[in-house]
């Protein structure tokens, strides 16, 4: 009888350890999800700041070009404006790619978390 009780206690201990391990895995995944969400916020901040900078630079180009009237300068300022907008598009595209990668990571992490939770429910 004592052997049966000892075995039951060992089994309970093993089960408790497994549950504890799964909870720890879930907490780690949730931390990684939060970290990825912070990355998304930083990407949005970078994009907002870059767009504001781009608008300011375009406005400066506009002001300078309106004060200096010569064909040569007009072309130069137009080239600057085009170059500035091209750079904005490149940065925006790069940030979009980063955002997509982070969103994919978040989706995978949620999937991994669900898998662990489902396995835990099956074994209960």
Where are these regions (language model features)?
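Extended alpha-helical coiled-coil "stalk/arm" regions
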Residues: 39-73
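Amphipathic, well-ordered alpha-helical segments in soluble domains
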Residues: 25, 53-56, 60, 87, ...
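Short, charged, amphipathic alpha-helical segments
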Residues: 44-47, 51-52, 77-81, 103-108
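Long, charged amphipathic alpha-helices with heptad-repeat/coiled-coil character
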Residues: 26, 32-43, 95-123
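Short, charge-rich amphipathic alpha-helices with coiled-coil/heptad character
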Residues: 2-38, 82-90, 115, 119
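Short, glycine/alanine-rich amphipathic alpha-helical segment
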Residues: 59-100
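Extended aliphatic helical segments
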Residues: 14, 18-19, 26, 43-46, ...
């Amino acid at each position: 009888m004592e052997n049966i009780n000892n075995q039951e206690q060992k089994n309970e201990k093993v089960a408790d350890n497994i549950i504890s391990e799964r909870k720890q895995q879930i907490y780690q995944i949730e931390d990684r999800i939060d970290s990825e969400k912070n990355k998304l916020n930083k990407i949005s901040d970078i994009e907002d700041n870059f767009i504001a900078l781009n608008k300011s630079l375009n406005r400066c180009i506009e002001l300078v070009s309106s004060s200096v009237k010569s064909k040569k300068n007009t072309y130069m300022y137009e080239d600057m404006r085009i170059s500035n907008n091209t750079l904005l598009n490149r940065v925006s595209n790069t940030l979009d790619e980063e955002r997509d990668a982070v969103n994919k990571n978040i989706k995978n992490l949620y999937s991994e978390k669900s898998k662990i939770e489902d396995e835990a429910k099956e074994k209960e």
